[in-house]
Amino acid sequence: ADCIVILNEDVACTAPRIALAIRQAKDNSGKQKATSLGIPQWQSSAIQLLVKSHPVPVFVLADGTNQTQTLASHLIHASSQDAVRVLSVVADNLNETTANDNRTDDSFSRYEANVEQLCRALREAERPLILAGWQQNQINDLKVAANLCKAVNNPGAMLCLIPDGSNSLGL
């Protein structure tokens, strides 16, 4: 993944292996840059410098403090309802929808810069990953994540819906 969006989910608690994968994916952009520059893999110090200067953007939309915030390069503190509104506006912008009912009040203006950053990152991404879950028992989280994945209109876009507890998905 080259852009990751996490909506109202503490992935570190509900899906620790996914949290590990996100932590490792943050280095992908720097490693790809090193490969394109012809830096051999055994030069780990040079690669680590590129990893630090070219991180994969990780947007975390959360209403409280959680362990997943340590993964974030962009942390958006918002109530659960506001986080859904932010992603709805992002989806509308990506679809270039002119009617935007989610911006009707002045309280939304504090999220405008975040919306622009997120739209830019999702447009530039080749393989964006959108994560949402059932941790907060909000069906709107799942709906807006699915709508955002559709709005990205990218065949490489990925959607991950996480159950409410660690190891709770049994097959």
What are these regions (language model features)?
Residues 1-171:
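Cofactor-pocket helix-loop regions in the catalytic cores of large enzyme subunits
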